[in-house]
């Protein structure tokens, strides 16, 4: 009976795959010129919609509800940019050729749009992550677990309210990633190397996101002068996150130290 029960019980990776957020649309108006303010405002509106989906996703993550609401909010605030850019690379990997960035179905960035957006170098950074997906032949199972680990990779320097519960959830997901690469037939005899490469990918996301946040905070401060719009959801998140990050209160949990 226990064997049947185990066979019928979905694995953690299967659960994570089934709860992935729906793809949302940017509402991109192709009749407007591709100026930096129009493109950035559209991306901000998209990010606001995506954050609603991220909150819904986080709520049903195994173990996340064991954290107090304050800790849940803190983790989402610290990781939103990481989650958004990682999901962007995944969509680009699945739906386009490697030279494009697939923000939503109605707004795909080619090199021309990257230049027009005033964030060409940042787009190149996101494109580099996409190329890592291609090189690693990233699977949906690996993507799903790494995404959870990104949610759990930045915390306040003085820790969370329930640090022990957080550490247990993070440890469980690290173990699941180890288990997954060990079972993968493509990784036979090389599971340690696959785990190393996947965790290096995870660490590299934080380096990119540091630059993305710097640009985001700048456009947020200068939004009126730059004519860049921010939806209410992002205003709330950034207003709370910005002083914490710039005061050095955010601690990133790396797998590898340089």
Curated annotation (Swiss-Prot):
Modified how: Phosphorylated.
Stored SUPFAM superfamilies: Nuclear receptor ligand-binding domain
Keyword list, A-Z: Cytoplasm, DNA-binding, Lipid-binding, Nucleus, Phosphoprotein, Receptor, Steroid-binding, Transcription, Transcription regulation
Principal place of residence: cytoplasm
Gene Ontology CC entries for this record: cytoplasm; nucleus
NR LBD domain span: 1-238
Molecular-function GO term, any one: DNA binding
Localization in the cell: Cytoplasm; Nucleus
Family from the record: Belongs to the nuclear hormone receptor family. NR3 subfamily.
Notes on the domains: Composed of three domains: a modulating N-terminal domain, a DNA-binding domain and a C-terminal ligand-binding domain.
Protein name: Mineralocorticoid receptor
Taxonomic classification: Eukaryota, Metazoa, Chordata, Craniata, Vertebrata
Recorded name of the encoding gene: NR3C2
């Amino acid at each position: 009976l226990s064997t049947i029960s185990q066979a019928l019980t979905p694995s953690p990776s299967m659960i994570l795959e089934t709860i992935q957020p729906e793809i949302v649309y940017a509402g991109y108006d192709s009749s407007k010129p591709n100026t930096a303010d129009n493109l950035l405002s559209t991306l901000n509106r998209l990010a606001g919609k995506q954050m609603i989906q991220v909150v819904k996703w986080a709520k049903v993550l195994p173990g996340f509800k064991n954290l107090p609401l304050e800790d849940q909010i803190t983790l989402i605030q610290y990781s939103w940019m990481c989650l958004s850019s990682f999901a962007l690379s995944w969509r680009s990997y699945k739906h386009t050729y490697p030279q494009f960035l697939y923000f939503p179905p109605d707004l795909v960035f080619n090199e021309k749009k990257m230049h027009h957006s005033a964030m060409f170098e940042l787009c190149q950074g996101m494109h580099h992550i996409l190329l890592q997906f291609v090189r690693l032949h990233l699977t949906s199972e690996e993507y799903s677990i790494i995404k959870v680990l990104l949610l759990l990779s930045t915390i306040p320097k003085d820790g969370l309210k329930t640090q022990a519960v957080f550490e247990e959830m993070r440890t469980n997901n690290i173990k699941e990633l180890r288990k997954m690469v060990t079972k993968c037939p493509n990784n036979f005899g090389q599971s340690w190397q696959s785990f190393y490469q996947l965790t290096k990918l995870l660490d590299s996301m934080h380096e990119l996101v540091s630059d993305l946040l710097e640009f985001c905070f700048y456009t947020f401060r200068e939004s009126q002068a730059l004519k860049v719009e921010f939806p209410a959801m992002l205003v709330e998140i950034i207003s709370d996150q910005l002083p914490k990050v710039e005061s050095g209160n955010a601690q990133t949990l790396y797998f590898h130290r340089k």
